[in-house]
Amino acid sequence: GYDCSDVAKNLAETQNIEKVLIVDSEAYTNPIAENISAVLVSISEGYSHILAPATTVGKNIMPRLSALLDVQQISEIVDVIDSDTFDRPIYAGNAIATVKSNDSIKVITVRTTAFEPASKGSSSVDIFEIEPPEISNHLSEFVGSELTKLDRPELTSARVIISGGRGMQNGENFKLLEKVAELLGAAVGASRAAVDSGFVSNDYQVGQTGKIVAPELYIAVGISGAIQHLAGMKDSKVIVAINK
């Protein structure tokens, strides 16, 4: 990344971390897959596993990395059986596949909601600065980004989420959920049906093709419960469904 020394220091104080490698350059201000995958390839020698969260950024970078290393990526693991074997959901989360890799380097994305956050360690490990490789591929360039500003918590980090589906009937009714969310300090989500109906933008979408969440409390209002939606919120601690 760029100007990421504070992140490196925080990682260095995390439990079970042995060392931290940092590549700090203005070239990595924005997470362009071509640039970051080149860095990962340059430092991959000597490592058996390279992991990233199954976020938008991770899903963009890791497939390219696996192609450059000529290995098979293992996507969205939810459990580690041993150093070669992992569990990952299939069929929209209705089944769990156990996958064993014989590749010398395992390239893996992790479904973060399946694991507890790492704790702080009792000491800090060493941080090693890595010289960034020369960027010779200019096929992609950063054009711009637009930050969505919300007064409520972000979906993937919220402790309470209230989501609406097609049963809300229209966008005006959907705004009722926003008022409840303000009272609860909750984030607002939506099913794909609600997004496709134009009630809210796709930033709200929870499910297999949206955001994967695991809040303490998930309130579903007017949602039929399609398996694609369940795949995105089934790890919630408490689920309350309101259909009428």
Labelled PLM ranges:
Residues 1-244:
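N-terminal glycine-rich FAD/FM-binding segment characteristic of electron-transfer flavoproteins
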